[in-house]
Amino acid sequence: TDLIGIRVFFLYREDWIHFHQYITNRFENKPELYIKNRLEDFDEDITHYYIAEKPKVYKRAGDTKIYDKNEIEIIADGIYRSLHYIIKYKGYYVEIQGRTLFEEGWSEIDHDIVYPYNTDDEMLKDFSTLLNRLSGMADEMSSYFRRMKGERERF
């Protein structure tokens, strides 16, 4: 039902909060505006810009706990990682996704090789799961390097 999709990438997973604040500072975010049915609840007003669904994060078990449950709906997915926002903008629903470069890399490879045609191929699913774990570790390591750099600069 969304006609426009935007992906935003960041280097470090903990930078999600800056992305989240950017979205919530520019678009009205009130639970009473959240839609239940995108077609039945459609708002014809093209001047009213708002967040149309509670923001969501899809995260994997073992991910660091950096998300605030009050600000964003946390969905524990076995593998997929991404932030999702549905915005009502100029009469259209716009989906905005945010993820790290490593998450995007895994997602594109998985989508190209496994989904939607080879979802029953156990070997491909195993390789996709392994690549997902490696991308998660790469995210953790990049964040660790960033913290190390900050510590070194303090001294």
Where do the protein language model's features map onto the residues?
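Long beta-strand-rich cores associated with HINT superfamily self-processing modules
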Residues: 5, 9-145
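Active-site acidic/histidine clusters and adjacent loop/turn architecture
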Residues: 2
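Intrinsically disordered, low-complexity acidic/polar and Pro/Ser/Thr-rich regulatory regions
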Residues: 148-155
